[in-house]
From Swiss-Prot:
Signal peptide: 1-19
Protein name as it appears in the record: Integrin alpha ina-1
Keywords, alphabetical: Cell adhesion, Cell projection, Cytoplasmic vesicle, Glycoprotein, Integrin, Membrane, Neurogenesis, Receptor, Repeat, Signal, Transmembrane, Transmembrane helix
Organism: Caenorhabditis elegans
Residue windows of the FG-GAP repeats: 21-85, 111-171, 180-231, 242-302, 307-370, 378-438, 448-510
């Protein structure tokens, strides 16, 4: 419960710091007429000494006869009359004529410069409003599209200088008043659009004319003086000779005058009265630029570039660099700084996507010489907004000293009117004495949708226009006026008073002793007292009288935070035994410093890193802080003096606490670690480290780590290795060193914390090579080791902190492939049947199985092996497709018997399988098929039985006749049929893939691995296509049909294998069945005589034997031929299966 209270207190503190002092709880609103773009421009102004809000509505009605949507300006008092309908809401100011009666006349009927009869329709009056923002100060209001001339309509624009009471003082229509040529209309000065932008200071007025000379643009400036004897100086860029510098640098559509301002930055001529006019040219060079125009009080009216034509260019095409500019002294050095907006510049990077960029150019603070303009500014500070379509930088305004800092530095605001899905936002940035400490992170973010009591539909385009720097409620702090023209809405955000509190810390010792803590809590490695000090700054006590310091008015919070992003928070606070602790504080801190002691300790589990300091954040907030509430329409304003806040950065303080590392006077540990390594019993050859592994299946690596200098804190050793090829390592010879594994393939050994200077560690790490199915593919073994610590080492000393090596492991595995035919001899004969007559597989012919056996004799497992078997499925024919030979019935299968007693059956792969495996779709007898299975346990024969079976299989595939019984019919007829009638031997035919006598396809059988001392069997089941052999080979002695198998190994495994036994063939002899095939060859007469005699003798013996056995008492079936009997027998077997 206590931790929850602390967490909520911290959250409250953080939210208070984030909000800072522009109040969003009780803003002053103004809602304008619908469709008028009320809020398109805003200005903080004083009528005499009375503050008012000047608000432009350029699509409003001016009230002049004969005009439509001419525009209007409203002056609004500081009150809570938010909506129209009340006399206290706002006053529409009529200022275009000295006599208000002229509003009753049509534009072309009034005195003065001739205005086109429709010249004030849509003139965008009050689209630009600027004010000096001081008591009794004047203002400037412009209508850039007012059109002059009786017959032609020239949008030359005009600006109206108003006195403090908003009465017309002067009118500026430079292109018309100076009679600049308009013969070529907009290509000259017929469309100047004066007043598109404007700026005003105590003695200078500047206007922008972006339409001059085909939108090349222009700038007009007027400087006057309170001294009536000083002359008024007017200068402008327009109507300069063609050779003028500004005409040579700018071209059509550069939009000079898009934004304007005045300042003194440090150019050589700014000594005394001269100033510099700055203007944005948003399409200059397609990327935009800021143009600098010296204003020197002389008789010339020419406003042009300085001697070295100094310009600041944008960096991105289409960024509109210079869309908005603001001149303000941010660091109080007496020289103005420049803020430039590029709202359409987009950036994307590893830190995100950004829409709109603002450049802050700090002056160097030095008066430069001629031709040194490039030295006037520092490189810019770049502000970015993470909302891609926000148009961050569309508006910028100075704020004055909004945070009330004692240096009285100016601050500024940036508008992003389309941030947060179009609602809009305003970002507050604070000035700084030290340019390097300028904070790019905003001190406050004001979101349009966060304002209270908004109408239905929420906010849109909040921040489109801004005006700041004036104290509108007279509480001593400047306020901010914000326009939202999409909603015809304006909000005045007032500043809350600031109590400037300062925070710091004190310690008895500058550093923390690692092992010398006093009165530490149980389980702590070390501890130390930490004093936190708070006090109210004496120079800024104007907010101190607003709170009661007789009691603890503040809430203090101390938090241990990470030193860097890659570290964690360390250090526990005894008050809460956690990283975070809060307590009431601050009584009498306005008159004296208050100190609060906290005991900080480090538990043993966090006591490893003694180099990285501890880091803390100390935060102070107002206890039980109250927030103002927006009053209802017409109620009294909330007095923000009763709602002070603490200063943004003084109330939050971060600091480091280092450890005493006992490393010299500077307490910086300069260490020098050295790493050496060597393989045991593996020599280094010209090809690197090469090891032939056999019975020894491990590697030994010996490492030596030495520290040649000061203490190495958190010294560690890391070794990366191939986890697929090596098992978990073991440290040999050092019981004190315990290895741990990081991830899958990194071993880590701590070397000491610290590892003292002049010390050495020597240890051996043993890796066992992986065997079996998890074994890797045999790439070179890579070892990468390095040592490091949190102490410091130079780049030269770091060179020997790493070690790398590769070892090529050569593994022995003896693969062998051999094959057998089952049966090895078959017969063909009978009647040749067409394919369409075949229904059952037995109708095709005799079944033949080719079995290939692959044995891994070890000692290593082999992975990624393929057997490629060439299968003779057709006779070779010059016409392409030949007659069927060995007709493959099933997809070949692989039977694998593993060393753990399990086995499984899988299928091989045949490309275009349906063309080669039973393409005639003849019904198969499943009795003969080998089915796929999952791994299962099988009974294994003894090795002696296997050897006996192997001995029975002849290696001489040509001598298959030895396995045929001597009394078979085929053998008998072969004895007499070896020679033909002409005495020549009968022919023996061969069908094989190697000699191109058969059409073949390839069967691919893939093995993920073959264990050592294990075997796999490939079974190919086919039938001899009887019709083919009857038709083509009836007159031959025998047909030798041969398939061929070859092993392919993955060479990347580094396996040492003898390739001589990686190929084999299987041969089947197909012989004619003589009794069923007519033999037209002549037989000698003496053979008939011998055969008859022998036949009579045999028949007589058989009859005698059978008669004695009672054989003739039973019915006898006629004797079929061998071939017919064989097929009948197979049919009966199939019938027995019930199919």
């Amino acid at each position: 419960m206590r931790e929850c209270i602390i967490s909520w207190t911290l959250l409250l503190c953080l939210s208070c710091v984030k909000s800072f002092n522009l109040d969003v709880n009780a803003p002053i609103y103004r809602y304008g007429p619908s469709g008028t773009n009320f809020g398109y421009s805003v200005a903080e102004h004083f009528k005499g000494d009375k503050p008012v809000m000047l608000i432009g509505a350029p699509r409003g009605e001016s009230g002049q006869t004969g005009t439509e949507r001419a525009g209007a300006m409203y002056a609004c008092d500081i009150n809570t009359f938010y909506n129209g309908g009340s006399n206290h809401w706002c006053e529409q100011v009529r200022f275009e004529y000295e006599n208000v009666e002229d509003y009753a006349k049509r534009p072309n009927e009034t005195r003065g410069r001739t205005v086109h009869p429709l010249g004030k329709n849509d003139q965008l009056l009050a689209s630009t409003i600027v004010s000096k923002g001081t008591k009794n100060g004047s203002a400037l209001v412009c209508a850039p599209l007012i059109r002059y001339h009786q017959t032609a309509a020239y949008p030359q624009g005009a600006c109206y200088e108003l006195e403090s009471n908003l009465r017309l003082q002067s009118t500026y229509a430079t292109c018309a008043q100076k009679n600049l040529p308009t013969t070529d209309r907009h290509n000259e000065y017929g469309g100047c659009m004066e007043g598109f932008s404007a700026a005003i200071t105590q003695d200078t007025i500047v206007t922008g004319l972006i339409g001059a000379v085909k939108w090349t643009g222009g700038v007009f400036a007027k400087k006057s003086s309170a001294n009536i004897f000083d002359s008024v100086v007017e200068k402008y860029t327009m109507n300069q000779p063609n050779g003028d510098m500004i005409r040579t640098r700018l071209v059509a559509h550069d939009y000079l005058g898009y934004s304007v301002d005045i300042g003194r930055f440090g150019f050589w001529y700014e000594d005394g009265k001269p100033i510099t006019v700055v203007s944005g040219a948003t399409r200059y060079g397609e990327h935009g630029a800021v143009i600098f125009l010296p204003f020197i009080q002389d008789s010339s009216s020419k406003l042009t570039l300085n001697e070295d034509k100094f310009i600041i260019n944008g960096t991105a095409m289409g960024s509109a660099f210079g869309y908005s500019i603001e001149v303000v002294d941010l660091n109080g050095d007496g020289f103005d700084d420049l803020i430039v907006g590029a709202p359409f510049e987009h950036r994307s990077g590893i830190d995100g996507n950004f829409g709109g960029i603002v450049y802050v150019y700090f002056s160097q603070g030095v008066q430069r010489k001629q031709h040194e303009s490039h030295l006037v500014f520092h490189p810019p500070k770049i502000l970015k907004n993470p909302d891609f379509y926000s148009q961050f930088g569309l508006s910028i305004t100075k704020l004055g000293n909004v945070d009330g800092d004692k240096s009285k530095l100016n601050d500024f605001a940036v508008g992003a009117p389309f941030a947060f899905d179009g609602a809009g936002a305003v970002y507050i940035y604070l000035g700084t004495k030290n340019i390097e400490k300028f904070r790019k992170k905003p001190a406050q973010v004001i979101k349009g949708n966060d304002l209270p009591n908004l109408p239905p539909g929420g906010m849109r385009s909040f921040g489109f226009s801004l005006s700041g720097g004036s104290d509108m409620d007279e509480n001593g702090y400047p306020d901010l006026l914000i326009g939202s023209p999409s909603k015809n809405f304006v909000a005045l955000l007032r500043s809350r008073p600031v109590i400037s509190i300062e925070t710091k810390h004190k310690m008895e010792k500058r550093m923390v002793d690692i092992d010398k803590g006093v009165n530490c809590p149980r389980g702590a490695k070390t501890c130390f007292p930490l004093d936190m000090v708070i006090y109210v700054d004496e120079e800024t006590k104007r907010g101190a009288e607003l709170v009661d310091f007789s009691s603890d008015v503040f809430m203090c919070n101390l938090e241990a935070i990470p030193f860097r992003a890659d570290t964690t928070a360390r250090g526990f606070i005894e008050g809460s035994h956690s990283h975070n602790y809060s307590w009431p504080c601050g009584s009498n801190s306005h008159v004296q410093k208050r100190t609060y002691r906290q005991l900080i300790y480090l538990p043993v589990q966090e006591s490893k890193d003694w180099i990285t300091p501890l880091k803390f954040r100390f935060t102070v907030s107002i206890r039980n802080e109250k927030k103002p509430v927006q009053p209802p329409q017409g109620s009294q304003l909330v007095d923000l003096k009763h709602y002070p806040v603490l200063n943004k950065y003084g109330a939050s303080y971060e600091f480091d606490v280092p450890f005493n590392t006992l490393c010299g006077e500077d307490h910086t540990c300069q260490t020098d670690l050295s790493l050496k390594a060597a393989f045991k019993d593996i020599p280094l050859t010209s090809n690197g480290y090469v090891s032939n592994v056999g019975e020894k299946d491990y590697l030994d690596l010996t490492f030596t780590v030495e520290n040649k200098k000061e203490k190495a804190y958190q010294a560690n050793f890391y070794l990366e290795y191939n986890e697929e090829e090596l098992e978990l390592p073991q440290v040999q010879g050092s019981k004190r060193m315990i290895a741990e594994t990081i991830g899958k393939n990194i071993v880590h050994l701590p070397l000491g914390n610290p590892m003292n200077g002049a010390s050495k560690h020597q240890f051996t790490i043993q890796f066992k090579l992986t065997r079996g199915r998890t074994e890797g593919i045999g790439k070179a073994l890579k070892f990468m080791a390095h040592v490091n610590s949190t102490s410091q080492e130079t780049e030269e000393e770091l060179k020997d902190n790493k070690w790398e090596a590769e070892v090529q492991i050569i593994k022995k595995a003896e693969l062998e492939i051999y094959g057998i035919s089952d049966p090895d001899r078959v017969f063909f004969g009978g009647k040749a049947r067409a394919e369409s007559e075949l229904e059952l597989e037995e109708d095709i012919g005799t079944m033949v199985r080719h079995n290939y056996t692959i044995i891994n004799h070890g000692p290593w497992t082999v992975r990624n092996v393929e057997a490629h078997i060439s299968w003779p499925y057709q006779l070779r024919s010059r016409f392409g497709r030949g007659k069927n030979a060995l007709y493959l019935l099933d997809v070949p299968t692989i039977t694998t018997e593993f060393t753990d007693g399990t086995s499984e059956v899988r299928k091989c792969f045949i490309k275009q399988q349906y063309e080669y495996v039973n393409p005639a779709e003849i019904k198969l007898n499943t009795k003969y098929s080998t089915q796929e299975t999952a791994p299962h346990r099988v009974e294994h024969r003894m090795k002696r039985e296997i050897d006996e079976d192997e001995e029975e299989q002849s290696d001489d595939l040509g001598a298959v006749e030895e396995n045929i019984p001597w009394f078979s019919t085929a053998n008998f007829w072969n004895l007499f049929a070896i020679k033909g009638g002409d005495g020549r031997p009968r022919e023996v035919k061969h069908l094989s893939c190697q000699d191109n006598t058969a059409n073949c396809f390839t069967v691919i059988c893939h093995f993920d691995f073959i264990d050592a001392n294990s075997a796999v069997v490939i079974d190919l089941r086919a039938r001899l296509w009887n019709a083919t052999f009857i038709e083509d080979y009836s007159d031959v002695e025998s047909v030798k049909i041969r398939s061929f198998g070859k092993l392919q190994l993955d060479e990347s495994q580094g396996i040492d294998d003898d390739p001589n036994n990686n190929a084999a063939f299987v041969e089947t002899s197909a012989d004619p069945d003589r009794p069923t095939i007519g033999d037209s060859r002549p037989i000698p007469w003496w053979i008939y005589v011998i055969a008859a005699v022998i036949g009579v003798l045999i028949l007589s013996l058989i009859i005698i034997c059978l008669s004695k056995c009672g054989f003739f008492k039973r019915n006898r079936l006629d004797q079929p031929s061998l071939y017919t009997a064989q097929l009948k027998h197979e049919r009966e077997e199939w019938a027995d299966t019930g199919l």
